[in-house]
């Protein structure tokens, strides 16, 4: 069939897709304006209640001691390169914490937002006796390199970072452990680079295509994801999150109902320290500024053997997503558990339960 005929036949579908994307983006930016108003009110309330803090965040001049805890591992930097031309590497430098080198397979940890490598402190201690555990600060999260441009945070580039990290550490595959944003990337990585992932452990994070499909039919999930709409706007999210010395971020971690139980002041500072440095909120928020670029996403079959752990009281993701994820799996490849009483922060709030499930799931790899 002549090319011009094919083009003509596809034209209505392409036009419909463009119109759909235009409609979606219009609704997204409308929701962004509403979210901006709500979060502005919240931030201003914090300022009025704590006037001495002012409208800006206080830069932390030195990291808390817990970030230098030697029992968690050695602090290293990896410059991302690939050894197979003509593929180009990003050349970015990523910070990571490593322990247990030579003790077994690579166990690579991917954190969520607003977190960093320190989110995996319990798992680094637990598994370093049998695995080479590596918790990375992902692109955009200081002290890893943080390009300012939104285009530097596309899914393709973020997946390349994971691939280059595995290869750069000298491995051909890994056990990929992830949470929140790290989980969203891990799902995609397992689809596009299945040979590099031996097993996956996911805590509270759905595949992007699944949450897109789920949210269309469950408006409650859209309300839970309200912050994503705010993050579509330039500069304002960074300003609001930093007001009253990062009170919105503090509340995220320490909220009586939805926060991390037992989080100490020093551990809270472990997360705030890097975010308090000039410009260090922009990289993490740029992840969200790319979320709607590829709408609509086509769901794909998931086949990597996966342990999925979900908090019963997760404030960010509805429990129904667990069943939705299961529908996209090859039968027999997914083991899922809902942890009673737990929320969004399972690796930090319920490490013992997580470790028990992980040891059982990985038992056959221990030899």
Curated annotation (Swiss-Prot):
<comment type="similarity">
    <text>Belongs to the AB hydrolase superfamily. Epoxide hydrolase family.</text>
</comment>
<dbReference type="GO" id="GO:0004301">
    <property type="term" value="F:epoxide hydrolase activity"/>
</dbReference>
<keyword id="KW-0812">Transmembrane</keyword>
<keyword id="KW-0378">Hydrolase</keyword>
<keyword id="KW-0256">Endoplasmic reticulum</keyword>
<dbReference type="InterPro" id="IPR029058">
    <property type="entry name" value="AB_hydrolase_fold"/>
</dbReference>
<keyword id="KW-0472">Membrane</keyword>
<dbReference type="Pfam" id="PF12697">
    <property type="entry name" value="Abhydrolase_6"/>
</dbReference>
<feature type="active site" description="Proton acceptor">
    <location>
        <position position="344"/>
    </location>
</feature>
<dbReference type="InterPro" id="IPR000073">
    <property type="entry name" value="AB_hydrolase_1"/>
</dbReference>
<dbReference type="GO" id="GO:0016020">
    <property type="term" value="C:membrane"/>
</dbReference>
<dbReference type="GO" id="GO:0005783">
    <property type="term" value="C:endoplasmic reticulum"/>
</dbReference>
<keyword id="KW-0492">Microsome</keyword>
<comment type="function">
    <text>Catalyzes the hydrolysis of epoxide-containing fatty acids. Active in vitro against epoxyeicosatrienoic acids (EETs) including 8,9-EET, 9,10-EET, 11,12-EET and 14,15-EET and leukotoxin.</text>
</comment>
<dbReference type="InterPro" id="IPR000639">
    <property type="entry name" value="Epox_hydrolase-like"/>
</dbReference>
<protein>
    <recommendedName>
        <fullName>Epoxide hydrolase 3</fullName>
        <ecNumber>3.3.2.10</ecNumber>
    </recommendedName>
</protein>
<feature type="active site" description="Proton donor">
    <location>
        <position position="288"/>
    </location>
</feature>
<feature type="transmembrane region" description="Helical">
    <location>
        <begin position="22"/>
        <end position="42"/>
    </location>
</feature>
<dbReference type="GO" id="GO:0006629">
    <property type="term" value="P:lipid metabolic process"/>
</dbReference>
<feature type="active site" description="Nucleophile">
    <location>
        <position position="180"/>
    </location>
</feature>
<keyword id="KW-1133">Transmembrane helix</keyword>
<keyword id="KW-0443">Lipid metabolism</keyword>
